[in-house]
Amino acid sequence: MRLFLLALLATLAVTQALVKEEIQAKEYLENLNKELAKRTNVETEAAWAYGSNITDENEKKKNEISAELAKFMKEVASDTTKFQWRSYQSEDLKRQFKALTKLGYAALPEDDYAELLDTLSAMESNFAKVKVCDYKDSTKCDLALDPEIEEVISKSRDHEELAYYWREFYDKAGTAVRSQFERYVELNTKAAKLNNFTSGAEAWLDEYEDDTFEQQLEDIFADIRPLYQQIHGYVRFRLRKHYGDAVVSETGPIPMHLLGNMWAQQWSEIADIVSPFPEKPLVDVSAEMEKQGYTPLKMFQMGDDFFTSMNLTKLPQDFWDKSIIEKPTDGRDLVCHASAWDFYLTDDVRIKQCTRVTQDQLFTVHHELGHIQYFLQYQHQPFVYRTGANPGFHEAVGDVLSLSVSTPKHLEKIGLLKDYVRDDEARINQLFLTALDKIVFLPFAFTMDKYRWSLFRGEVDKANWNCAFWKLRDEYSGIEPPVVRSEKDFDAPAKYHISADVEYLRYLVSFIIQFQFYKSACIKAGQYDPDNVELPLDNCDIYGSAAAGAAFHNMLSMGASKPWPDALEAFNGERIMSGKAIAEYFEPLRVWLEAENIKNNVHIGWTTSNKCVSS
């Protein structure tokens, strides 16, 4: 009995000590979160200065400050080991401590960390500074990706001109950084192992807090693949009509330079030559925006109005004062790739975008403002929770609004779409146009990370790195480069996110769940009823819906304080990511395409590409 009593007293003493420690830990975290917000703000300011004016001095400053923060994070990780946080009662404290033990690249030794920052800066800077010569004038060599090269790739229908720009860009944006990329993979792997992951792939996937996540995506993609193959077959059939058999084969992969986008990630720019009913208008309000004197400022004001119409948060004054929404004309180099920034203070949020007055850019504005709304909704949370429920949630928010903005119903409402008659043919045109962005993107997005996972996991011999990239693009997307590539080339970093070390799975996840969000928001707004043909999902406008806004608020204000299924549940009662909503949205198109492809004897699927040879 005495022994039992002593054991009980010892247990009570330990428990009391733990309760006491938990109170201290709470206070420690409160102070630490404030300090981290302050320090991250300084780092973000330096990154902003560099991204909006690429100079050696700004790069040096940015990297020095990042190194300082990394050092501090190491000290924090060391401090957290002094707490027995895994035994605490509070799930919230456990979650915060767990987040703080993930050091990422800061786990690297100082020299390696500095080298990694230099390597990433070199790749990002190379990408931002690419200039090529004019196809028709070899003395004019100042064409940048944004806007000049992208303009040609989207508008030109001369396949030789397109192939020229494709090769020039990939050679300069990709091949030029092969050695840096190899070193980046080595350092990424080293950091992952120091964080107790087997590779960088597992480190990235850990953000989704689900061991089966990779398999779930494979399964969802397998469900969507038949629709993608129908779209691919139909587009190839129409491109053959336009360019002829010598340029596009009947059964092979599609030459990617013909698809209106440098990376063939979305094909809506070639809608004019592949749209199902060419005599019916396609929704493109770019010309009307020009005619009505739209400016980048007006586009952002409209986006702000959409959020506030749903009772969500208005853009703060700091946003208008500090954002860069047009390409500066003073000749400086900057990263033009649209991005949204959180400075971890109160109401200091910004966008950097070289905005052009086009329909597509109007949607991009809403996408970026979705990030900003998320920042504003969770800014009351402790620093460690000031991020998305998972990376895909952050990307999806603005896209839900873009799906709504792009409907004929909304564009008519705001006076940009005139004399539009929505019959069955116009509807198929519109669904097809949306699919060229939303369905076509899925295999592309998957391959961006499947490729890097394979390098991080050491599954591909270095001698085959380039052809491994094209093999995946062929296998998943059925596209190929316009010219033969070899291991003398290195093409993956010609995509910004690969040069800049941005995980890409977030976009795949976003393109799936945004349809889940959209469907639920449309039902809440009384804009979609599966049993009412007058209220279809593909013409639902959630503008002005306080009910949809409240659902967004419930989810966004949680930040990362709970695992993402809890955030999804707060929005619509579901806990599982599913491809059902995206299938529902495109069902009328699937039915039409299958019949049309059979009628035209269109080949579905593609033979293996021979456009990359391992030397």
UniProtKB/Swiss-Prot annotation:
Cofactor remark from the record: Binds 1 zinc ion per subunit.
Enzyme Commission no: 3.4.15.1
Positions annotated as active site in the UniProt record: E368 (proton acceptor), H497 (proton donor)
Subcellular location: Secreted, Extracellular space
Tissue expression profile of the protein: Expressed in vesicular structures in spermatocytes and early spermatids (at protein level).
Sugar-bearing residue positions: N53, N196, N311
Disulphide bridges: C133-C141, C336-C354, C522-C540
Positions that bind Zn(2+): H367, H371, E395
GO molecular function, one term: peptidyl-dipeptidase activity
Domain Peptidase M2: 19-607
Disruption phenotype: Male flies are sterile.
Top EC category: hydrolase
Gene Ontology cellular component list: extracellular space; plasma membrane
UniProt main location, coarse: secreted
Catalysed reactions, as listed in the record: Release of a C-terminal dipeptide, oligopeptide-|-Xaa-Yaa, when Xaa is not Pro, and Yaa is neither Asp nor Glu. Thus, conversion of angiotensin I to angiotensin II, with increase in vasoconstrictor activity, but no action on angiotensin II
Biological processes annotated in GO: metamorphosis; peptide hormone processing; proteolysis; response to symbiotic bacterium; sexual reproduction
Purpose: May be involved in the specific maturation or degradation of a number of bioactive peptides. May play a role in the contractions of the heart, gut and testes, and in spermatid differentiation.
Protein name in UniProt: Angiotensin-converting enzyme
